[in-house]
């Protein structure tokens, strides 16, 4: 399991890392409010040392939005400086040819993040698949199972269909398969987590499943702990 840095958008890095240590979590998807895109080598080294002090590794960066070629260049250069091999990103559709060249140049995998009904860009897994299926195999998706479901798409069925291009996952639960569905602590919504975990094992998923907690974001700690505990419990119970 990992943690999506966005879960701590209202908190500094120290608070984030203390929380991860308390939860015995060791993998973080790095957001740029914790490590700015213009960070230099010295700042990045200090950042990694701070993570190491808490037993945490930054396994990816993002999500990073890319609305121009310059922003594509900046995102991939940042990922290389940070030293990760996975960039969670949201490039505009018209930039995908340019993004593909960057993927080849940097040899960094791109996991396009979907946002369900909340924005028109990459609303679900099928949309991402249709845009990457004929491109470099290092272009795939960050499957956000909650956002995907709120768009009306079956996240578990989509994982089965597209698992070869699922490089990262954002874990959350929701209360309904519509835009009106609310974010919920994992286990309190409608997602079938025992089946989800069994599918991850069946298809030999090797990426991170990172909690992106988007409920009570100014006081998320109890919800984060509940979600992590539930998910771990289901993992144990389904072995």
Annotate each language-model stretch with its function:
Residues 14-17, 50, 54-141, 149-151, ...:
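Active-site acidic/histidine proton-transfer and metal-coordination neighborhood
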Residues 1-86, 104, 164, 228-239:
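N-terminal pre-domain/capping segments
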Residues 4-6, 31, 62-64, 90-93, ...:
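Active-site-proximal beta-strand/loop segments in catalytic clefts of secreted hydrolases
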Residues 1, 5, 9-26, 125, ...:
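Histidine-acidic metal/acid-base catalytic patches
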Residues 37, 44, 72, 89, ...:
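Flexible, glycine- and charge-enriched loops at secondary-structure boundaries
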């Amino acid at each position: 399991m990992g943690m999506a840095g966005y879960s701590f958008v209202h908190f500094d890095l120290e608070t984030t890392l203390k929380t991860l240590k308390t939860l015995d979590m060791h993998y973080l998807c790095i957001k740029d409010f914790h490590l700015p895109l213009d960070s230099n080598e010295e700042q990045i080294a200090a950042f990694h040392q701070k993570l190491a002090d808490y037993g945490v590794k930054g396994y990816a960066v993002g999500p990073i939005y890319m609305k121009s070629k310059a922003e594509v260049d900046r995102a991939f250069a940042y990922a290389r400086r940070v030293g990760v091999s996975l960039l969670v990103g949201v490039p505009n559709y018209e930039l995908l040819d340019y993004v593909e060249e960057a993927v080849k140049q940097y040899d960094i995998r791109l996991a396009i993040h979907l946002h369900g009904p909340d924005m028109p860009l990459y609303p679900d897994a099928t949309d991402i698949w249709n845009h990457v299926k004929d491109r470099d195999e290092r272009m795939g998706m960050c499957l956000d199972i909650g956002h995907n479901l709120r768009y009306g798409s079956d996240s578990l069925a989509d994982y089965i269909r597209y698992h070869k291009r699922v490089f990262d996952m954002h874990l959350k639960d929701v209360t309904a398969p519509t835009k009106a569905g609310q974010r919920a602590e994992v286990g309190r919504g409608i997602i079938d987590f025992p089946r989800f975990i069994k599918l991850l094992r069946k298809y030999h998923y090797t990426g991170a499943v990172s909690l992106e907690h988007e409920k009570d974001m100014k006081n998320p700690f109890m919800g984060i702990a509940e979600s992590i505990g539930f998910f771990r419990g289901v993992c144990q119970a389904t072995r």
